[in-house]
């Protein structure tokens, strides 16, 4: 009894057959182990090229077993073939055509779906990259840096520096608004106190001006006295002549209105 299970038929299924392998080549190799009924190499219905496998049918099952035992994993026509017993009867050309059509339809449908999926993913990636580039360009064109007048190149600030700058501006504006509100909300008492302090300072300045004028007058009188002291002493004749001239001028002034009355 053979170590292989006896199949219902005497056909061997041969895989990994070379494309240029002919039925005569397989018949020559397998015919060494017994008489062969048929050798069938299926061809593609549309391309008319070998499909990569073949069927070899023996007359006796024992010859098929010997061929399987000796030729499995052997090199034939440049390929390492694999052999096992075929399951079921040999299919007719019409059955093979229908099977090929189903496989072609399913494969083409799968390929179409795969292409559609890939194209959608690529288009989505393109849209995403375009939207990113648009957002980047929009931010660059409408950023406050570009609104400044062109001149010397400024050093680019980082995000943290910009945040600090904004925070400083906000705090400065808040302090301004608080100072304005405080100045507006000052009570009337403070205004009165300010006016009183101003009047007091004004009176002080007046007092100081009076004292300055007095001191100036005193200093002037002292200066006159000192200048008189420094003058040389006059002679008696000069003083007498001056007194006489003064008395004459006085008498003339008194006589002038009387003469006008006459």
Swiss-Prot record:
Tissue: Widely expressed.
Entries under InterPro entries matching the protein: Nucleotide-bd_a/b_plait_sf, RBD_domain_sf, RBM, RRM_dom
GO terms classed as biological process: cytosolic transport; mRNA splice site recognition; mRNA splicing, via spliceosome; negative regulation of mRNA splicing, via spliceosome; regulation of DNA-templated transcription; regulation of mRNA splicing, via spliceosome; RNA splicing, via transesterification reactions; spliceosomal tri-snRNP complex assembly
Residues annotated with Phosphoserine modification: 23, 106, 108, 129, 131, 133, 158, 160
Keyword annotations: Cytoplasm, mRNA processing, mRNA splicing, Nucleus, Phosphoprotein, RNA-binding
Coarse class of the protein's main subcellular location: nucleus
Record's subunit section: The phosphorylated but not the dephosphorylated form interacts with TRA2B/SFRS10. The dephosphorylated form interacts with SNRNP70. Isoform 1 interacts with FUS C-terminus. Isoform 3 interacts with FUS C-terminus. Interacts with YTHDC1, leading to inhibit RNA-binding activity of SRSF10.
General function of this protein: Splicing factor that in its dephosphorylated form acts as a general repressor of pre-mRNA splicing. Seems to interfere with the U1 snRNP 5'-splice recognition of SNRNP70. Required for splicing repression in M-phase cells and after heat shock. Also acts as a splicing factor that specifically promotes exon skipping during alternative splicing.
Protein name (Swiss-Prot/TrEMBL): Serine/arginine-rich splicing factor 10
Species: Homo sapiens
Upper classification of the organism: Eukaryota, Metazoa, Chordata, Craniata, Vertebrata
């Amino acid at each position: 009894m053979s170590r292989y299970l006896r199949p219902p038929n005497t056909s061997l299924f041969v895989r990994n057959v070379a494309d240029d392998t002919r039925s005569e080549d397989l018949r020559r190799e397998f015919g060494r182990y017994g008489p062969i009924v048929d050798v069938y190499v299926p061809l593609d219905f549309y391309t008319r090229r070998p499909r990569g496998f073949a069927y070899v049918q023996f007359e006796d099952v024992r010859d098929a077993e010997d061929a399987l035992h000796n030729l499995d994993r052997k090199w034939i026509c440049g390929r390492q073939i694999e052999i096992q017993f075929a399951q079921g009867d040999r299919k007719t050309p019409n059955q093979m055509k229908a099977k090929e059509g189903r496989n072609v339809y399913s494969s083409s449908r799968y390929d179409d779906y795969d292409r559609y999926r890939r194209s959608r993913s690529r288009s989505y990636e393109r849209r995403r990259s375009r939207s990113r580039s648009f957002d980047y360009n929009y931010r660059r064109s409408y950023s406050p840096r570009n609104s400044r007048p062109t001149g010397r190149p400024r050093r680019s600030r980082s995000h943290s520096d910009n945040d600090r700058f904004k925070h400083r501006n906000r705090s400065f504006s808040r302090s301004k608004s608080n100072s304005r509100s405080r100045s507006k909300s000052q009570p009337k008492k403070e205004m009165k106190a300010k006016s009183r302090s101003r009047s007091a300072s004004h009176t002080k300045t007046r007092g100081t001006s009076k004292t300055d004028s007095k001191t100036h007058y005193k200093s002037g009188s002292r200066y006159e006295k000192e200048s008189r002291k420094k003058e040389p002493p006059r002679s008696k004749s000069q003083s007498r002549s001056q007194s006489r001239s003064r008395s004459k001028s006085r008498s003339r002034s008194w006589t002038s209105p009387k003469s006008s009355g006459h």
